[in-house]
Each structure stands twice: as C-alpha cells, then as structure tokens.
Amino acid sequence: MIISKRKINVRTIRNLHNGEGLTLRHGRPVTYKTGWQVATHGVECTTPEEVAKLIRTAEYAEACGIWLDNDIYYVDHSIRVATKHAAVKLGRECNQLSIFGWGRKSDNALEWL
C-alpha cells in the first residue's frame, strides 16, 4: 500500500478531468499492488467544495473513491477485498456497475459487472 503524505483539498478535486478519479484513505490518495476495490454506496456532488466536505465525514473518511464524469463528482464509500470472486459478490450485493482491480494494467483495471 502506498499512501500519499498529503491530504487532498478542493484544488486537487477541481483538477480532476472527466473520467479521472482517486481512491482515498483518511483523506490521502492511496494505491495498492493487489486486491479489488468495491463501492458499497455513494453520493453525487456537483462542486469540489461539496466533495471536500463529504470526504471529511465519518462515513467517508476511512476509505472512499472519487471520480468525475460529465461534471458530476461521484463519491463512494469503498472496501478493498483480496479476490475478484469476493469483489464481484460484494459489488452485486451493493448494486454496483463495476469493480476496480489494483494489480491490473490501468487500461484493464475496471471490471464491469
């Protein structure tokens, strides 16, 4: 696990481009070498300020993902699991459209359910 030393801020969120995202742990960008990231539930936000406020709440502070799509910021509470099987099962239980594989090449990291 690699965790950035710096917490993100509104500027970091504002600098996301369409289709880009971040995974956060305690407000800091994080990457893993293995495992799968699965969202359990989430919220849509329209401004970077809304996102910054949300990720400081107890519900989203520990682990969450942010991504920008067509000017909407999606903020999801997420869980990292070890296997694809566990990720698919949890993703389907939580009505998710996809899961994210950490150990995969960036162009194949997203698996649609």
Question: What do the predicted segments below correspond to?
Answer:
Residues M1-L113:
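Conserved, structured core segments of small domains
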